[in-house]
Amino acid sequence: MKILVIGSGGREHALAWKIAQSARVSEVLVAPGNAGTATEAKCRNVAIKVDDLDGLLALAQREAVALTVVGPEVPLVLGVVDRFHAAGLRIFGPTAKAAQLEGSKAFAKDFLARHGIPTAYYAVHTEVDAALAYVREKGTPIVVKADGLAAGKGVIVALTLAEAEDAVRDMLSGNAFGDAGARVVIEEFLDGEEASFISMVDGKHALPMATSQDHKRVGDGDTGPNTGGMGAYSPAPVVTPEVHARVMREVVEPTVQGMIADGVPFTGFLYAGLMIDAHGAPKVIEFNVRFGDPETQPVMLRLQSDLVDLLEAAIDGKLDGAHAQWDPRPSLGVVIAARPYPDTPVTGEVIAGLDAVPASAKVFHAGTALNAAGEVVSAGGRVLCVAALGDSVQDAQRTAYAGLKPIHWSSAFQRSDIGWRAIARERQAQG
């Protein structure tokens, strides 16, 4: 069978790589893909943009694609699933209405409140003066979020009143995020440890994937501005078996049932960005309606089941009978980005050393392309993610960083401490 993966990032390379391992798959089409998917076994890039729904639909029909997997949020919010369904094609992802869980933070917060799912207190504002008054009343630290899609960057954690006021003004009157910032959600700052809890959902049932923890800040020690994510590891030790049970009971199940109750059943990858407090109580920071990036890369390294079998079960509404097998070893992925990311990065630089990466690490491509000479060049902010398995998180970290050592181009940089929380825990446990 032929499978289509929509997207061009590290997440899509990891999904295509895992899908290509299935004996049931003859070819994986990736639209538009990157330099990694261009050379991955059984994969072929097709130059169609993720927001070209007509082109994607025509491709799936022309190539007799058996099923389509959507990587990024943009085509989901635009309604790619609705278009494919209308044409009678099999596709895994939420409808445009269900994708509002990510497409609008106000929609998500109202949904959480309506269904009694734990989250931070919040208010939605469209007027600068009212928003500023609310911020002054609540005090800091406080979180200001652009309502719409902002590629993971429309969130300001304000530690001072001046920062909060600047964020409100930037988003509402300065138009820092265009239409995405025409409304802002202002919410309480949550204390605790973050975890990414991703489930496959078939409309009625949820099958949890391995947990993971992302590193959002650009700098070591979680400093500097937020990014789309600088690295991740799986599993997240903060999600103990007890916390896992609570998340399923208090967050995932009520979300699946709540979407049914609202007449918008959810099918797809449901990503709950959680804050776990000192007592193990989870609160939802945000929903994404697709697999995380860079979490997908280490999570796919650990998945031992045939992903195609799971996708088929999800599309057929049969996840209650499905089971996912995981490598017990932890995995860790480090993003190599291009300066000055998260500001507009330098692109078009030739990436050297990819052929010298040891077999113990897997390089997933994100913002890469092939130039006219067939060389791999940088083409985005987050360029590569080097991932590895290990007997411990520290071991996986060591192998991943050894794996990225030969890779270089002049604007390249990465954090040196991905996995630091889990490694501190491991050291503590060893006494």
Curated annotation (Swiss-Prot):
Cofactor(s) the record lists: Mg(2+); Mn(2+)
Keywords assigned: ATP-binding, Ligase, Magnesium, Manganese, Metal-binding, Nucleotide-binding, Purine biosynthesis
GO BP terms: 'de novo' IMP biosynthetic process; purine nucleobase biosynthetic process
Involved pathway(s): Purine metabolism; IMP biosynthesis via de novo pathway; N(1)-(5-phospho-D-ribosyl)glycinamide from 5-phospho-alpha-D-ribose 1-diphosphate: step 2/2
Disulfide-linked positions: none
Xref: PANTHER family: PHOSPHORIBOSYLAMINE--GLYCINE LIGASE, PHOSPHORIBOSYLAMINE--GLYCINE LIGASE, CHLOROPLASTIC
Protein name, UniProt field: Phosphoribosylamine--glycine ligase
